[in-house]
Amino acid sequence: MKRKILLLITAIAAITAVQAQAPERTANQDKYYVRRATHFDDLPVHRRDIIMLGNSLTDGAEWNELLGNPNVKNRGIIGDIIQGLYERMEPILKGQPRKIFILSGVNDVSHGVDGDSIGRVMEKLIVLIKERCPRTEIYLQSMLPFNTDVQMWKLLKDREHVVIDGNRAMEEVCKRQGVTWINLYPLFVDENGKLREELTNDGLHLLGPGYLIWRDAIWKYVN
């Protein structure tokens, strides 16, 4: 178990190390990541389950209550990158869940990763799921916009275009792999290409009304 988590953190650190703009993970972030990942490792996944997989945006919602479905399970972790999802998939894959909803990529953007690379890593994750869980329905959701006018995220400054490029690359992955693409981006973006101010208090994470928009967008795929 400890070795798996160390490998997971190493994978995230490896991406960080090669990116000139990459932030260092704080000790508290690493501790939270380990707590969350080891917790998930001990929680069973069943064939009837619906998995919400992602980063802080996913982590921030009570999905089973939001979607009115006790089989919906949250597997989001603050700060995670796409490679991090890949490295911690084993407990999910063992359970052969009915559906997996993925939303990830903005932390990769903040680490200096380009759109095409985001698409490649996401495709690796999707191929893994398809190979190990051939009956699982996969739903890939687009990255959301962010808004550095609300709060300055210096590692995201002037990188709005990478979100657009990454979404385009991931949509092509969905076409190649035959999985469902859910484009959330237009629902959250304002006329200036930024996350709508009324949906956030820090320019990146969602307030309650934002989660209601997200819920409504995926409702027909969940139920």
Where are these regions (language model features)?
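Charged helix-capping and loop-helix junction motifs
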Residues: G115-L125, V163-G166
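Extracellular/periplasmic catalytic domains that process cell-envelope and extracellular macromolecules
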Residues: L43-R47, L66-L67, K94-G95, R132, ...
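Acidic/histidine-rich helix-loop elements
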Residues: P23-A27, N69-I82, S110, G203
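A short helix->loop->beta-strand "cap" motif at the edges of active sites that frequently abuts
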Residues: C133-E137
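Oxyanion-hole/transition-state-stabilizing segment in secreted/luminal serine hydrolases
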Residues: L53, T58-N71, I82-R120, Y139, ...
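N-terminal secretory targeting modules
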Residues: M1-I51, D59, W63, N223
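Second-shell loop/turn segments in exported
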Residues: N74-R75, N107-G115, L156-K157, T200-L204
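Catalytic His-Asp segment of secreted/periplasmic serine-dependent ester chemistry enzymes
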Residues: P145-N223
